[in-house]
Amino acid sequence: MRVLPAAMLVGAATAAVPPFQQVLGGNGAKHGADHAAEVPADHSADGFSKPLHAFQEELKSLSDEARKLWDEVASFFPESMDQNPLFSLPKKHNRRPDSHWDHIVRGSDVQSVWVTGENGEKEREVDGKLEAYDLRVKKTDPGSLGIDPGVKQYTGYLDDNENDKHLFYWFFESRNDPENDPVVLWLNGGPGCSSLTGLFMELGPSSINKKIQPVYNDYAWNSNASVIFLDQPVNVGYSYSNSAVSDTVAAGKDVYALLTLFFKQFPEYAKQDFHIAGESYAGHYIPVFASEILSHKKRNINLQSVLIGNGLTDGYTQYEYYRPMACGDGGYPAVLDESSCQSMDNALPRCQSMIESCYSSESAWVCVPASIYCNNALLAPYQRTGQNVYDVRGKCEDSSNLCYSAMGYVSDYLNKPEVIEAVGAEVNGYDSCNFDINRNFLFHGDWMKPYHRLVPGLLEQIPVLIYAGDADFICNWLGNKAWTEALEWPGQAEYASAELEDLVIVDNEHTGKKIGQVKSHGNFTFMRLYGGGHMVPMDQPESSLEFFNRWLGGEWF
């Protein structure tokens, strides 16, 4: 049996599944012949086998029970590590000269600014270790690409010069009132999927049609907010590096640096309310990234709330709801037969026991087996049916593009030389999802770690919205509702007992139309969105923009 990625588009689970299961990725997986054209010598097949040998040596020091568990996990591995590398290969790239960019913000310059504090003593204007970071900014001509003409746009890179990491971003100013509208950072998941898929498939100002042309989106989230789309971690989308990020905490440092330098360059946006939104594996990212921002008392980031859509945040609670969602208890017909449903029920106690051990130790030695066992036992039965894991209502129509042909259109568009040139990208090819990164995070134990424990700390300071399209399987609404009710925080009892109420459109010609359900107490809100799959803004664009605008307006907090 081979380890193959059971990818969650914008939230991928690396699960052990039967060898006939198609590797999801298509155009997103190493697009173009130049993807790995420049590979360091130590990234040979022999180089990749070394981690496995070291890994096997470490196993000798474990208890008999732990070794038995790892022997079971090892049966899921390919014989040769060059078939399943634990490190992402560097992308071929060509760095543009400084003269190409309109602005370069040096982290060392920002770090050198001292001010007089309230106690009369000198202190840095902003906190954080920024010396190694630079931000490169290019004002992009909307007319050259036909994407939201008339709307101000910036693209560029955050450079971590110490670790040779370069994160690509694309900023769109609000169509409405940019001097007063909030700013939102959007993050897709994976781990290892580009946020530009969210831009062009979900909530950005344009989608890409079959002719590989941009099409105006009336329901774009920059209708009433300025939005930053960030390709992170490195080696995702247009981002690149010769090093790697393998856990969510490390990625959080980069995001803090990006925002700090961006708002330093553009103080007109820094004064606006700021929010972080994302989906799927962003259920891991966002609690960490928001906590990182809030940990800095001296900051220029006006964080007001976070929004997580169809996220994976608390595996212990959420994995319990794969069987109900697959077996007809989530509001849609059953996908699995009774025998498969029973096998999932039988596997759940062991799965939760393993996750519980992961939560206690937070050790990769415990968390990795939990991820692989639980994904194999509770995700693979659904995958084998050929049904779309992101939408229980239909089959996976395009397995080479994570079930959606539109992802292939996006990849084709972003690989056009004229697009790469217009946005200043420095890689020779764009890939929508990098499954090497997915494995990096998995084998560092990140997948099952208890990042939900950070949410109570967020609730003390800012509002948190958990929303879920109710047709998604992979990060389904049942599990998301359940973990929010199980979360221990001062308002738990009142929140858990709150009833779901109708969510209706209030501000357009469809006023009164029911689009979902909502419950809220204090700073915590959950929404179920009717008819939405894993990507709510793609499936239900009107409903998506409705709740988004109202959330930013403070209706539920």
Curated annotation (Swiss-Prot):
Gene3D superfamilies: 1.10.287.410, alpha/beta hydrolase (3.40.50.1820). Disulfide bonds join 193-433, 327-341, 351-374, 358-367, 396-403. Pfam families: Carbpep_Y_N, Peptidase_S10. Residues 1-17 form the signal peptide. Glycans are attached at residues 224, 523. It catalyses: Release of a C-terminal amino acid with broad specificity. SUPFAM superfamilies: alpha/beta-Hydrolases. PROSITE patterns: CARBOXYPEPT_SER_SER. One of its GO terms (cellular component) is fungal-type vacuole. One of its GO terms (molecular function) is serine-type carboxypeptidase activity. This is Carboxypeptidase Y homolog A.
